Amino acid sequence: TFFTMFTGIYTVPLEKTETGFAKNVIILIPDGMSTDGVTLTRWVYNDGRPLNMDEIASGLVRTHNSDTIIADSAPGGTALATGHKTQDKLRGIKPKKAVLYASDKNDEKDYYSPVASVLELAKSMGKSTGIIATSEIMHATPADFTAHATHRSNYNDITEQQVFQNLDVVFGGGEFFLKAEN
């Protein structure tokens, strides 16, 4: 799944530069892509030369679950969207179990409570927001920015939340879940 989320949120650099402040943010998430896979692509398909994507500013983050070292797309996307690690299958909500480093320890009253995403923050600031996905928009990573659910497969609930997010642009699959009869 390849996923893009964009916002009109302003970023604040540590120091003001001569060029000013960023006006817009576009986040590209090639879900499941690894540095090893990119390196192999350079060597096999591009004779070791840089790829076009190498010109894009990028970074790496640790998106392990709150309770296991390997994350699937839903908790991995939640970590990217909210800055909070969560458990397998959860999206956009606090975990019940948080035992690994960099995981928030929650009080029992906070289990499964929603955490705001960067997209929701941008919308609350009056910015234009949107998501673009090569999968269904209610799939794991795109939905981490636009919904809160106790299971990544709750497509009907997730879709309803996405409709009421008032996104300005939405491109992706999932038409079946957007029809009124479903």
For each feature predicted by the language model, list its residue ranges.
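Double-stranded DNA-binding cores of transcription factors and transposases
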Residues: 7
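N-terminal catalytic scaffold of extracellular/periplasmic and nuclease hydrolases
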Residues: 10-181
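Bacterial N-terminal signal peptides
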Residues: 1-4
